A protein has these predicted regions:
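Short loop/turn segments that flank or connect secondary-structure elements
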Residues: 1-165
Length: 165
């Protein structure tokens, strides 16, 4: 699949309509810091959050909620007519959606899949909302501490992998 690279000045239809379309049928991987952020917002322990709302020992958010019109399961944190029940504690993947972030040569790059902006298919109403620069979007999503946590976690995982060989 084609990947479109972006820069912080890229202007995109990033104002969220809060329709919840992105909360269905996804795979959201979590790092330990995100698991902790979720549990704090839910006011339960990390272990309780992991056991109730995650799969594979806490590394993947469970999508076992009510299905949408396409038959895709809702995120375990999604509430009809409200949205994310733990919005302030949401992980980096949700903060960046529909964008992705990849690290190459120790530099972060923001991307989206395909040559057409992903939200336009299921959330065409975003075209009627104000467009934002990628930099403005990231600031509004408060992504920075989550990016730092993700970067540090990736270093730890790489070090573990290096030790194995």
């Amino acid at each position: 699949m084609q990947v479109t690279k972006l820069n912080t000045q890229s202007i995109l239809p990033l104002t969220c309509s809060r329709s919840g379309t992105c909360c269905f049928g996804k795979t959201v991987m979590l790092n330990p810091w995100e698991l902790l952020s979720f549990s704090k917002e839910k006011k339960i322990t990390s272990r309780e959050f992991r056991d109730l709302y995650c799969e594979f020992g806490g590394i993947r958010l469970r999508f076992n909620g009510k299905p949408d019109k396409k038959g895709q399961q809702a995120c375990s944190q999604y509430v009809d007519n409200i949205g994310c029940s733990v919005h302030l504690g949401r992980p980096l993947a949700c903060r960046l959606y529909p964008l992705g972030r990849q690290i190459q040569s120790n530099k972060a790059h923001y991307i989206h899949q395909g040559d057409t902006f992903p939200c336009l298919t299921d959330c065409s109403e975003v075209l009627d909302l104000p467009k934002l620069s990628l930099g403005e979007y990231l600031k509004g999503q408060e992504a920075d501490p989550f990016e730092k946590a993700q970067d540090e976690y990736l270093i730890v995982m790489q070090n573990i992998a290096d030790i194995a060989f």
